[in-house]
Amino acid sequence: MKNILIFPFLSISTGHHHVADALQAELESQGLAAEKIDIFSHSYRRLEKLSSVAYLKWIQYFPKTYSGIYRLLACGEFQHDKRYFMYEWLFTQQMRHILQEKQPDIAFCTHALPSYLLNRLKPEYPNLTVVNVYTDFFVNQLWGRKNIDYHFVPSTEVKKQLISEGIDQNNIYLTGIPVHQNFEMESADTLQHHPPYTIIITGGSMGVGGILKWVQELSPGGKILYKILCGRNEKLYSYVKSLHHPLIEAIPYLHSKAEMNRLYEQATGIMTKPGGVTISECLQKRLPVFIYHALPGQEEMNLNLLHERKLVTDMRNWDMQKAEEYIAAFFQSNEQMKEYKKHVNGYLGEMSDRKIKDVLKRIIWKQKNTLLK
């Protein structure tokens, strides 16, 4: 039996955890147990909780500062010899303890920090297979490169970037951002071609971003039924319920991926923020995506890349009173819908390794054969 670890980061429910859950579910479906470990809460539980709150407050109240610092520290041209001494000081010994205690055969990293640490520690653990699983549509400088065995990449652009940085193309898999197996079944063309269209609005579960403001400015005209996915945001849920509007529905926290998949199946399109996992789920389901807000840092970067490839519609500068007309016109336009499908099919067609279960089987088989040599 393989000993498999998955490393997200922080305890807040971000894309790192959703991808970790997707990998864990896929491995378990193959009869393999995998343990998720957040090195921060594992090592400094109280500090992690404080840091999570501080992070959310920072991006909420000082978005430009966060964006600037993120671009300065995490973006730009990759430097092979760049060191992050604070991270090493805080977490290297903690990671060693985890590796010594758990004795993993394979480690999947869904966040850059554990990837950085394992990249540095890998020479001490030559039999350990380390896999980077990228959860955004770009790769920042912190992710480990040199000693990482495999890379699950979101696009051909990222594959080309990694090859230019010296990564062997045979170790790169074009998986897209992995989504839970519940979302992998592609929908038939069930999009409504006449109003009222069903639009899911999501992206407010953590209480940051512009979702409440957006909902407050909704002006339903009968062409769209809005379903607001509130998650654990009680303030948002209470507000939407208090409207008592027949065309604005509050959806409480969903307890399973199957429930979310059913909601996707009922939808004509999605209004959301450009988080890597949500966008990947929508692309998988071929649901048109309208972006109403982007958090500083990763989401800004994602949006730029997605907009460039015409995979999403940026509605941040739309006249709110006319937004419903614009969206309805999009669905009623054969030309716009055809163009959208062309770009999405083009993107999905590039994902030569989309069946994540097959990629996992291949990696596990290779790891087993390596140990037998």
Curated annotation (Swiss-Prot):
UniProt cross-references to InterPro entries, sorted A to Z: Diacylglyc_glucosyltr_N, Glycosyltransf_28_UgtP
An MF annotation (GO) of this entry: hexosyltransferase activity
Protein name in the entry: Uncharacterized glycosyltransferase YkoN
PANTHER family, alphabetized: MONOGALACTOSYLDIACYLGLYCEROL SYNTHASE, MONOGALACTOSYLDIACYLGLYCEROL SYNTHASE 1, CHLOROPLASTIC
Signal sequence segment: none
E.C. number: 2.4.-.-
Family stated for the protein in its record: Belongs to the glycosyltransferase 28 family.
Keywords: Glycosyltransferase, Transferase
Species the sequence originates in: Bacillus subtilis (strain 168)
Classification via Pfam families: MGDG_synth
Gene Ontology annotations of biological process type: glycolipid biosynthetic process
Keyword Lyase: no
One Gene Ontology CC term in the entry: membrane
